Design a protein with these regions (language model features):
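Beta-strand-rich domains and repeat architectures in extracellular enzymes and scaffolds
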Residues: 44-89
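Short loop/turn segments that connect beta-strands within beta-propeller blades
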Residues: 95-99, 154-159, 215-219, 299-303, ...
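Blade-loop segments of beta-propeller domains
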Residues: 86-142, 164-168
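A short helix->beta-strand "capping" segment at the edge of beta-propeller domains
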Residues: 19-53, 105-117, 261-266
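Blade-level signature of beta-propeller repeat domains, shared across WD40, Kelch, NHL, RCC1
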Residues: 316-349
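Beta-rich, blade/repeat-based domains predominating
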Residues: 50-65, 121-144, 168-188, 195-196, ...
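Short glycine/acidic-enriched loop and turn motifs that connect beta-strands
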Residues: 75-79, 142-146, 195-198, 250-253, ...
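Fungal secretory targeting signals
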Residues: 1-18
Length: 349
């Protein structure tokens, strides 16, 4: 297995590119992007909440219910005393309307969605999420007095949840950020940076920033990669042989040759606007990542194919059906409609 990292460079393109969103958000750098975008891609607003940044991470589409689950960015809980306001993160469920035919919608009326704040226990400060069995597996970042780890939640009311993992070698995780499930063996791979400590809601870390592999059947947990600055988003290639990890520090290194360990590590690409965050693959093996000016798309070889420009940037996103991409833009939820043949590798629909 190869671990490929996506690092970053900071420059003025984030602002310059974002201003072009309204004119044409779909930017092509390579002819292969035309096939992915289709002849008439669209970008539309699904929901906006001007009060809180409800659409920050996770992005888990449940096809059987046509629902989407997202986690917010941190915000100050107004229900606590002003002098001791606590940071809070909420899970939001968005019930989507039936999807219109991709790329053929003209003079659209505003899309109406139903929005519900999910109340559940055992997922303190939720962040990344992924489809898992009959529900969702979340990264629970934890707090000063609650455990961090991985938590499973049912995707239908009453949204029962439970911890699946809370420690490594009797040491608490720092603040798990994102996760992915290997499609062949069901193992769960996740990143654990120190954001929680840096952002003031977790104790001082007792583990370095690393990538872990958890085997639910045997309860085995092992470190599969280290040496990261801030490991963040994580995704597998469609064949499961390459693991992509977004990081804010460029690095090179070697792993251990083993079926459950990476054989090599390499820098895959550099995000040219802001810090790379969420990362996904399509069924062709192309790599998509959210960053400071929207979503960038690379070929499996690391060639920049195109971008979906979004003012304010994109922390995370997920594929829906037949060319849909749900884009998390903090206080806005957007939907891009690309070619129907452009499908996410995770669900393949």
């Amino acid at each position: 297995m190869i671990i490929a990292t996506l690092a970053y460079t900071l420059w003025a393109a984030a602002t310059a590119s974002a201003t072009r969103e309204e004119a044409n958000p779909f930017t092509i750098f390579h002819k292969d992007a035309k096939r992915l975008f289709g002849p008439s891609p669209t970008l539309e607003l699904l929901h906006e909440n001007k009060s809180i940044p409800f659409a920050h991470e996770a992005g888990v589409f449940i096809p059987q219910d046509n629902t989407l689950f997202v986690t917010s960015n941190r915000f100050q809980d107004p229900s606590t005393q002003e002098q001791q306001q606590q940071q809070r993160i909420v899970i939001t469920k968005i019930s989507l309307p039936p999807s219109s035919s991709p790329n053929k919608v003209k003079n659209r009326q505003p899309v109406r969605v139903q929005v519900e704040e999910v109340q559940t226990r055992n997922i303190p400060m939720p962040n990344g999420g992924v489809n898992y069995k009959h529900g969702i597996l979340f990264c629970a970042q934890g707090s000063m007095n609650t455990s961090s780890g991985l938590s499973f939640m049912e995707s239908r009311p009453p949204y029962r949840s439970r911890y699946m993992l809370q420690s490594y070698m009797n040491r608490p995780f720092s603040s798990p950020n994102d996760l992915v499930v290997h499609h062949r063996d069901g193992s769960i791979w996740f990143t654990d940076p120190i954001y929680g400590f840096e952002q003031g809601f977790r104790p001082r870390p007792r583990l370095p920033s690393q990538v872990y592999r958890f085997e639910p059947r045997t309860r085995s947990v092992r470190v599969v990669a280290d040496g990261f600055g801030r490991p963040n988003g994580i995704a597998f290639s469609p064949d499961g042989r390459v693991l992509y990890v977004t990081d804010t520090h460029r690095f090179h290194g070697d792993g251990v040759v083993d079926d459950t360990h990476p054989a090599t590590m390499r820098v895959f690409a550099m995000a040219d606007a802001g810090v790379p965050d969420g990362i996904k693959c399509d069924v062709y093996g192309n790599v998509y990542s959210g960053s400071g000016d929207g979503i960038s798309i690379w070929s499996p070889g690391g060639t920049l194919l195109g971008k979906i420009l979004v003012s304010g940037g994109v922390a995370n996103f997920c594929f829906g059906r037949r060319g849909e991409i749900f884009i998390l833009n903090e206080k806005r939820l957007l939907r891009a409609k690309l070619a129907p043949s452009t499908k996410g590798a995770l669900l393949g629909i």
